[in-house]
Structure formats: C-alpha cells, structure tokens
C-alpha cells in the first residue's frame, strides 16, 4: 500500500513536471509566434526604410553633386563671362586713351572716340583679352614685345591684368612674361620688353 502511494506520488510529480514542461513549451511557442513575425516585419520595414534611406541619401548626394557642379559652372561662368566696355587711360604726356583703329595700328588718342572703346573680357582668373568694339580687332603681343591686332583670338591676345597701388592697372602678356602694354608721352606704343610696371607708361585706368 505504501509502495503504491509512493509510486502514485512519484507519477503525479512526474506528470506535474511534464505538464509544467508542456505548458512552458506551449507558452514559449505562443511567445515565439507573437515575437518572431515582428522581427520579420521589422526587418522588412527596416529593409524598406534602409532602401528609402539609401535612396534619400543617393538623391541628396546627386542633388549635392549637381549643386557643386552648378556652383562650379556658375563660378567658371562668372570668371570667364565678365565683359566690361572701358577706355584705358594712360596718364603720360597730355594723357592718352588706348585705341584700336580699323587699320590695326594701335596708338593713343587724347580725345575719346569710338575706336578707344575696348571690351575687356576675362578669359581666365586674372587674365583678360582686349577687343576693339568698333574695329572688331583683338590686341595681341608677340614674343618681341610688339603690339599688333588680329581678328581672331589666340594665346598672344591674353594679358594679365594687375591692380597697382595707385589704382591703375598694368597689362602684362600672359604668354611672354615681363612684357607690358605701354604708351609713350607722345601717344605711341612702346615695346613691351623695354618697360616695367614701375613705369607710368604701363599704367592704365579703366574708364567708362
């Protein structure tokens, strides 16, 4: 009898343990069933969000790149696109304006006239071209420092425009450094290799 009671108690305890284990497994299964879909959804959503995030980032990157390119184009356009119509006044002798007549003989004129109106265009940073508006000729300088005119633009038409302490400008050949545009006290063109920016003959004041 006692043995039967002990066996019953042992079986009851074993059943209780099994039942407890089964209940725990069922509870765990329910919990997993509730939890597992969420990470999947979260992963799906996360992937979608990540995709959207990458898409947004890519869009912003493209926009930023476009902005940078636009900025570069704007800067380049700003630097290269500046065109000023001015007369270059040299305060030597009685004072002369640089002129480009239709015969191409560059000289200085005391009085303003249509041939003394020049279009100063920026072609590079700090580098300009000088174009006679009326004569449609570019001012150029050869390797000997002599000025001449040409209807077409090329490297000898490039001049470095430098602002001097007296607020005048000096125009140095970009191709042949150390040669400058200059006018004598008689209004004649001087050879660019014989002058320097410390000489007044190379100083020009842009006037409207």
From Swiss-Prot:
The Gene Ontology terms for molecular function here are:
growth factor activity
Q: Which cysteines are joined by disulfide bonds?
A: 90-157
Q: Which residues form the signal peptide?
A: 1-37
Q: Where is this protein found? A: Secreted, Extracellular space
List, alphabetically, the SUPFAM superfamilies matched: Cytokine
What is an annotated GO biological process for this record, any one? positive regulation of cell population proliferation
Q: Which GO terms describe its cellular component?
A: extracellular region; sarcolemma
The UniProt keyword set, sorted, is: Angiogenesis, Developmental protein, Differentiation, Disulfide bond, Glycoprotein, Growth factor, Mitogen, Proto-oncogene, Secreted, Signal
Sites carrying a glycan are 45
Question: Which Pfam families has this protein been placed in?
Answer: FGF
- Which domain of life does the UniProt lineage start with? Eukaryota
InterPro entries (alphabetical): Fibroblast_GF_fam, IL1/FGF
Q: List the expressing tissues.
A: Embryos, adult muscles and adult testis.
Task: Provide the function of this protein.
Answer: Plays an important role in the regulation of cell proliferation, cell differentiation, angiogenesis and myogenesis, and is required for normal muscle regeneration.
Subunit record text: Interacts with FGFR1, FGFR2 and FGFR4. Affinity between fibroblast growth factors (FGFs) and their receptors is increased by heparan sulfate glycosaminoglycans that function as coreceptors.
The record's family statement is:
Belongs to the heparin-binding growth factors family.
Which PANTHER family does its entry note? FIBROBLAST GROWTH FACTOR
Q: What is this protein called?
A: Fibroblast growth factor 6
Annotated source species: Mus musculus
Q: Which lineage ranks, top first, belong to the organism behind this chain?
A: Eukaryota, Metazoa, Chordata, Craniata, Vertebrata
């Amino acid at each position: 009898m006692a043995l039967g009671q002990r066996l019953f108690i042992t079986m009851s305890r074993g059943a209780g343990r099994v039942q407890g284990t089964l209940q725990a497994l069922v509870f765990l299964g329910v919990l997993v069933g509730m939890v597992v879909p969420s990470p999947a959804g979260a992963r799906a959503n996360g992937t979608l969000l990540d995709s959207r995030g990458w898409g947004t980032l890519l869009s912003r990157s493209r926009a930023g790149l476009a902005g940078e390119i636009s900025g570069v184009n704007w800067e380049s356009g700003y630097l290269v696109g500046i065109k000023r119509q001015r007369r270059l006044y040299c305060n030597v002798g009685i004072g002369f304006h640089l002129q480009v007549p239709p015969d191409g003989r560059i000289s200085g004129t005391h009085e303003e006239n249509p041939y003394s109106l020049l279009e100063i265009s920026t072609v590079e940073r700090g580098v300009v071209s000088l174009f006679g508006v009326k004569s449609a000729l570019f001012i150029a300088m050869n390797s000997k420092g002599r000025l001449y005119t040409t209807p077409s633009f090329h490297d000898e038409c490039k001049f470095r425009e430098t602002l001097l302490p007296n607020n005048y400008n000096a125009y140095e050949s970009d191709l042949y450094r150390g040669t400058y545009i200059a006018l004598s006290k008689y209004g004649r063109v001087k050879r660019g290799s014989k002058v320097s920016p410390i000489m007044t003959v190379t100083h020009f004041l842009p006037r409207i």
